[in-house]
Amino acid sequence: MRVGLDIGSTTIKCVVLNDAGQIVYSTYERHFSHILEKGRALLEKVAAEYLPDGRAYLAISGSAGMGLADSCRVPFVQEVFATRVAANRLTPGTDCIIELGGEDAKILFLTNGTEVRMNGSCAGGTGAFIDQMATLLKMGADEMDKAAQSATRTYTIASRCGVFAKSDIQPLINQGAQAGDIAASIYQAVVNQTIAGLAQGRPIKGNILYLGGPLTFSRTLRQSFDKTLGVTGTLPENSLLFVALGAAFYADEESDLREVAKRLDNYSAAATYVSLPPLFADQQEYEAFHARHMKATVPCLPFGADCGPVHIGIDSGSTTIKLVVIDNNANILFESYRPNLGNPIPLVKETLLKLYRDHPGLQIASVTTTGYGEELVKNAFHCDRGLVETVAHFTAAKHFLPDVDFIIDIGGQDMKCFKIEDGAISNIFLNEACSSGCGSFLQTFAQALGYDVKEFAALGLFADKPVDLGSRCTVFMNSSVKQAQKDGASIENISAGLSISVVKNALYKVIRASSPEELGRRIVVQGGTFYNEAVLRAFEKEMGVHVIRPDIAGLMGAYGAALYGKAKAGENARSTVLTEQELAQFSQKVNTVHCQGCGNHCQLTVNVFADGKRYISGNRCDKPVTGKANNEDLNLYAYKLKLLDGYRSTPAPAAPRARIGLPLCLNMYELLPFWHTLFTRLGFEVVVSPFSSRSLYQSGQATIPSDTACFPAKLSHGHIHWLCEQGVDAIFYPCMSYNLDEHLGDNHYNCPVVAYYPEVLEGNCPELNGTRFLYDYFNLERRKDFYKKFQQSLDKYFPGLDKKAVREAIDAAYDEYHRHMQQLRDKGSEIIAAARAEGRRIIVLAGRPYHVDPEVNHGIDQLIIRQGAAVVSEDSVSWHEQKFQTSVLNQWTYHSRLYAAAKYCTENPDMDLVQLVSFGCGLDAVTTDETREILQAGGKLYTQLKIDEITNLGAVNIRLRSLFAALEERREVQAPLALS
């Protein structure tokens, strides 16, 4: 008999084979991290029921199996090898295996030797991710699969991280999208993540095998893979057990299973892990801590007829709805905290009706809304005002600590931090790349270990040796936890370690503080996560100060909104909110349409209410609402696109020498005027790829070799694919280490991705095999060399070009480039002058030349225009500055412009900078800190927007509105500065 055990990140699988290789017993169950106990129970059961003498050939495999194999001295077989053994035996001729597990994803290429690709730093697109999404849709995994079968369309959803997929999905739920469409979109996101992130440019073809839980249980997921890959994959019998079967086939050592189980029973690891000091020295210290935090309270009074006028604050969050009623003395009369179940409107209606019915004659002086659903709730119920959530939280914090200088709010899946200087918000931090410092992080672990989250948190309070877990992705922290368990850590010490890691992640990953002291000394902590006393204590210990944790930590947004409404309402105010009679007649209808008003083609959600009032969301300009588009006269991004589009409509020569393609990506956004002019003058017909789109991105997705490349680089694969489909004679996309020197920095390099990505395209785009691809190295700064180098390069492909004609074409190209850049500078100056004449704020939307691509910036420029500001770019103002000293090596042209633009903003009171950062950009780890320092040294706010393929702009909108609210607040606090 043969026995194979596969212990994965979330499940344990076991197979028993008879001498003919047939399965006589198999099991597949979750282990909830109780690996030793489950393993022992399985071995005892198999020995008792299937092995009369207790002996069998035994091997163990799986991502969590090595520790168990070591503990009981049994052979361990690596899971990739076990999978290959099983595939060779059971499905010979397999070319490729796609396996999705609970927290890991793998692609095994078996043709021409074995090659394996596994997920590295992120567990998006795995079984755990699908489970999270099913929970969000209030479905089981089976129900989600069934719902997806009825889908009629798909939406763009990030599978990079469960939390950020939530930020894409939650608005769709709120906007009334069909559950089946969302479910199908989730499966498609998993497919995209697997192909782009794991295949890394290697084609997936031939006989394909699907393995692992998600692919076994979801027919829709298999169909999505089949459709995207253009093949029909096979789901083999016993697909869940392949690794266990491989281990059983591989086993070459006979073991006594009863003896092995006994070894596990006697196994007790010494506590050898790295530990941290306990949260509390003793019970007395805890009681003093508990008593101190019970003082930050808001009086809650009975809600009677004599309460007078009341003020209501409604915080419509991404997953919850909070409502607070206060009197004129800021006492709480009523509070409500409920999950919004995807649509806040019915819950708000229900709560308002309850207030009217329970309190006849109720006088409502003001209703103020805040949060993600602020505008929707405000418009639906005719509330008096909306308030951006950062200001709502700040207003509430000031009530508890008037001279507060730092606020941190940790919710279930988001984190907000504000620095306060001179009574106004001076800096805002949001988690943009990872959720491992949020409440859902602890909840995930509590559930995985079989505990309620409150019970789990309480376990850690008196842990004697908390595990040092560092701060990592939610999913990959699991491996740290398993290792700690193997090393003898108790559940109590793991709970305490996780609470400490939440705090460290918030401070050092999100805020990126170099030391706790720089954040502040008068701190208010908010959000539901701080009800967890272990997290609260860990935060105080890490910061070295006592903090204020209000007893309404989870209601601070709603409370702040109510306070703000009270302050603005004035004497004898009466709210415009719907009356009891109007609420009884209230109804809401939701439908989604694509706006055809401009090239953005925004997906609009139209809410129609019983009184005929409409609320439209999802629009990036005002055209769907007012019938008029945004005023593009004050938008330099729109002007840049218009100039670039002009080159596409240039007529081709009558008898072109050849058709040459230019991919409009990365540095081509800056150098298109140069190359287009050069080739046109030489008699070529120039074919320029279009501005990027979702479909163009997906057309090149299969050839992307690494998921770590920035989104603008990934887009270039689609541009190459498009040009090849046009049948051009050649594609020209040179490698360029250097830019033209603008004398703003110590050197004038391109970043490595921009400089050398043509090499990556040449090596990974099979369609280039049928098209000449010209990607020689050029340096435009060395003009004399360039004449010669360019002539030599072109002669290889198009011999016989006249030297004089080439020189004249090059001279014309330089002239056109300089003319184009001067046009941008002149237009920037014109916009700034016009904005000043109208008293508008001016935002320098700073990034790289390719951030003007609509698919990259997602219309963020339009959002800023909607706030009533003007938009210019970094290259339209950087020329005002001379080279200056920076604290980092200033050697990249695009970054030199960024630093110069930041400095220019500090010299102009009506200008502020918003930095666009592409997710995954390594150099921006440096530039963001330097830009922040330059701006803060000049008394300016720093705002960073991280962007990639995610198109939902809810968080971006909040960020921008927070900036404008903070600027307005500063203007009120300080006397206005005179313009220089």
Name the predicted role of every residue range:
Residues 165-196, 479-508:
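Adenine-nucleotide phosphate-binding core of ATP-dependent small-molecule kinases
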Residues 4-45, 115-116, 120, 314-354, ...:
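Short glycine-rich, Thr/Ser-proximal phosphate-binding strand/loop in the N-terminal lobe
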Residues 34-35, 112-153, 240-243, 249-253, ...:
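Glycine-rich phosphate-binding loop plus the immediately following alpha-helix
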Residues 64-65, 198-228, 239-243, 370-373, ...:
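Glycine-rich phosphate-binding loops at beta-strand->alpha-helix junctions
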Residues 85, 127-132, 237-271, 395, ...:
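Glycine-rich phosphate-binding/hydrolytic loop that grips phosphoryl groups
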Residues 76-80, 226-245, 384-391, 540-559, ...:
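Conserved phosphate-binding/catalytic loops in two-lobed NTP-binding clefts
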Residues 106, 253-309, 416, 567-632:
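Acidic, glycine/GT-rich loop-and beta-edge segments that sit at the periphery of enzyme/chaperone cores
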